[in-house]
């Protein structure tokens, strides 16, 4: 869950292993995929916590945020995915929201919810799509294979 990163400091303090941030890895991958503004497809809770906004700002990129209505619709679609609904109707809803982000200037999109990749994929989006789960998995594998040094906690 991306929103769990709201407790990042507490998690890092409670464990002795390196902490890999799904937020940092997703933003790094999105930044590498396109030169312009980054669209954020997320839940209301994650958005209100400001987790991605801060990381995107640190990367010196503009954020294309969802409207309140889009956040609500995204949450409804995520709830449907959690209930096992991977229908064309859910796909259509996600396509519409991502297209709105593109129309407002997003040159890349971060799918910042671990349920989204169960339905949303690159073929559905006209700009580079970074799935937060995939970004975290890629970094974890690179660290496990010692292709990159472990992060400092």
Q: What do these predicted ranges mean?
A:
Residues 1-153:
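Non-catalytic structural scaffold of enzyme domains
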């Amino acid at each position: 869950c991306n929103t769990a990163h709201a407790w990042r400091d507490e998690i890092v303090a409670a464990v002795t292993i390196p902490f890999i941030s799904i937020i940092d890895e997703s933003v790094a991958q999105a930044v590498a995929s396109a030169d312009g503004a980054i669209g954020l497809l997320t839940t209301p809770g994650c958005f209100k916590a400001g987790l991605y906004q801060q990381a995107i700002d640190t990367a010196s990129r503009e954020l294309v945020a969802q409207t309140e209505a889009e956040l609500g619709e995204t949450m409804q679609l995520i709830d449907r995915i959690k209930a096992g609904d991977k229908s064309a109707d859910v796909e259509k809803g996600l396509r519409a929201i991502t297209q709105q982000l593109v129309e407002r200037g997003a040159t890349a999109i971060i799918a910042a919810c671990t349920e989204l990749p169960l339905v949303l994929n690159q073929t559905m989006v006209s700009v580079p799509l970074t799935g937060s789960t995939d970004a975290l998995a890629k970094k974890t594998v690179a660290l496990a294979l010692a292709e990159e040094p472990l992060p400092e906690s």
